[in-house]
């Protein structure tokens, strides 16, 4: 079952987000297995992230790569809200 993961870190700038994205790409996780959609939004130090993964298992596997990267740049992701997806409407 697909899941949505919403991250609202206590503080994250666009520059910090961009740095994490570059580090994920270098680690071979720029396009992780099972991720269907990814978006980042917000302003200032209030950047937020929403992902949709095809399964909890693939999301958890991505987390095994993501969390050490976040720790290496001292970024606290906060506690994500993770819920099953009821529907996705495109367009």
Task: Walk through the language-model features, giving the residues of each.
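Short S/T/G/P-rich N-terminal loop/turn motif that feeds into the first structured element of a domain
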Residues: 1-50, 54-68, 75-91
């Amino acid at each position: 079952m697909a899941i949505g993961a919403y991250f609202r870190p206590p503080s994250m700038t666009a520059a910090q987000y961009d740095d994490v994205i570059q580090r994920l790409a270098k680690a071979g996780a720029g396009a992780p297995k099972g991720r269907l959609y990814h978006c980042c939004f917000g302003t200032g130090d209030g950047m937020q992230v929403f992902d949709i993964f095809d399964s909890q298992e693939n999301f958890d596997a991505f987390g095994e790569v993501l969390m050490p990267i976040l720790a290496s740049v001292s970024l606290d992701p906060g506690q994500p809200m993770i819920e099953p997806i009821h529907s996705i409407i495109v367009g």
